[in-house]
């Protein structure tokens, strides 16, 4: 384990790894700081970085297994201790590292008796196993077992469909997430208007990436998301003759609201509470915190008023209108 004393820069913005350790082959931990930041910046960066770490980084997984001896995934094979389902679950947990794109094939071909572990997987050159000791199956008798595997690189997760069977091959739930967890915390220092912040970022990975590698990749992904905004040319918001500015309304909120009132004028809006509208929990909580309790309260707010609510988005306004128009 490597741990360094935190030294805060008072001028130049800089980041540093202050703690790094490997708890096991499949669990790495890293702790980083970024400072000095102005008030509010640490939370902005921390939230964005956490989402990028958990959702934007690609990983490699086994996504399908095939064997001629398997009638269905809840069956048992004579001479093998584990059920087919247990073998598929064990394959799901194999941690791989690669830079491949697309799909690759791998193979397990073993003669019993004996234990089958990750080191028995015959992999393409572009893929490596993080922990060769990961258990797959136990052969109790002198039988031959061959399993073909499909390996893919992606991000997020992919849940198998129970009816998605191709030529006796079985899909495997895949979690393409090298980062197992990420947290951020904030330390404030200074006085009065000169308060500054330190962002602490903790990252746990499955060993296919180190926390430092994950941080770099998440940062690149965030930068790539914002690059298009740097190339927006001002004239794209004007007509070709540059004489009239084009106004792009988000959507005709006012017109839809007027129509809604006309259609439902017979309703007593003040007696319809927002918890009767079956709104998503986040939208409901945002409205309640802003003292919007009834449909009348809601309709008395303009689009501009609603999007000023903390954690409320323009998409939420549209969703509310869609729900109301269906009532």
Curated annotation (Swiss-Prot):
The reaction(s) annotated as catalysed by this protein in its Swiss-Prot or TrEMBL entry are: RNA(n) + a ribonucleoside 5'-triphosphate = RNA(n+1) + diphosphate
Enzyme class at the top of the EC tree: transferase
Subcellular compartments: Plastid, Chloroplast
Task: Locate the region Alpha C-terminal domain (alpha-CTD).
Answer: 267-327
Determine the domain of life of the protein's source: Eukaryota
Kindly state which keywords UniProt assigns to this record, in alphabetical order: Chloroplast, DNA-directed RNA polymerase, Nucleotidyltransferase, Plastid, Transcription, Transferase
What GO terms fall under cellular component here?
chloroplast; DNA-directed RNA polymerase complex; mitochondrion
Transmembrane intervals: none
Q: So what EC number does this one have?
A: 2.7.7.6
Q: Which GO terms are recorded in the biological process aspect for this UniProt protein?
A: DNA-templated transcription
Q: Which Pfam families match?
A: RNA_pol_A_bac, RNA_pol_A_CTD, RNA_pol_L
Q: Name one GO molecular function term.
A: DNA-directed RNA polymerase activity
Which residues lie within the region annotated Alpha N-terminal domain (alpha-NTD)?
A: 1-233
Subunit structure, interactors included: In plastids the minimal PEP RNA polymerase catalytic core is composed of four subunits: alpha, beta, beta', and beta''. When a (nuclear-encoded) sigma factor is associated with the core the holoenzyme is formed, which can initiate transcription.
Which family is annotated? Belongs to the RNA polymerase alpha chain family.
Q: What does this protein do?
A: DNA-dependent RNA polymerase catalyzes the transcription of DNA into RNA using the four ribonucleoside triphosphates as substrates.
Q: What is known of its domains?
A: The N-terminal domain is essential for RNAP assembly and basal transcription, whereas the C-terminal domain is involved in interaction with transcriptional regulators and with upstream promoter elements.
Protein name as catalogued: DNA-directed RNA polymerase subunit alpha
């Amino acid at each position: 384990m490597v741990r360094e004393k935190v030294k805060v820069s008072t001028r130049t913005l800089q980041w540093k790894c202050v703690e790094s350790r490997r708890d096991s082959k499949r669990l790495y931990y890293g702790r980083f700081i970024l400072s000095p930041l102005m008030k509010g910046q640490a939370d902005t960066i921390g939230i964005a970085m956490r989402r990028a770490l958990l959702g934007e980084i690609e990983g490699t997984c086994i996504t399908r297994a095939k064997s001629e001896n398997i009638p269905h995934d809840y069956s048992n094979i004579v001479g093998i201790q584990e059920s087919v389902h247990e073998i598929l679950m064990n394959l799901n947990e194999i941690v791989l590292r690669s830079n491949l794109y697309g799909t690759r094939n791998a193979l397990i071909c073993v003669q019993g008796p004996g234990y089958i572990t990750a080191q028995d997987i015959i992999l393409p050159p572009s893929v490596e196993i993080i922990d060769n000791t990961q258990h797959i199956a136990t052969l109790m008798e002198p039988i031959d077992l061959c399993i073909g595997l499909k390996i893919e690189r992606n991000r997020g997760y992919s849940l198998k469909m129970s009816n998605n069977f191709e030529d006796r091959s079985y899909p495997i739930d895949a979690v393409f997430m090298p980062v197992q967890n990420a947290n951020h915390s904030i330390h404030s220092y200074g006085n009065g208007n000169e308060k500054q912040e330190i962002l602490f970022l903790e990252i746990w990975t499955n060993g296919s990436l180190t926390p430092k590698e994950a941080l770099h990749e998440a940062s690149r992904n965030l930068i790539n998301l914002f690059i298009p905004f740097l190339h927006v040319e001002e004239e794209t918001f004007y007509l070709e003759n540059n004489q009239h500015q084009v106004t792009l309304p988000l959507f005709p909120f006012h017109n839809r609201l007027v129509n809604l009132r006309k259609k439902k004028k017979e309703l007593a809006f003040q007696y319809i509470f927002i918890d009767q509208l079956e709104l998503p929990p986040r939208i409901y909580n945002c409205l309640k915190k802003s003292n919007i309790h009834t449909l009348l309260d809601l309709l008395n707010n303009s689009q501009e008023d609603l999007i000023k609510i903390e954690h409320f988005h323009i998409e939420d306004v549209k969703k509310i209108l869609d729900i109301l128009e269906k009532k």
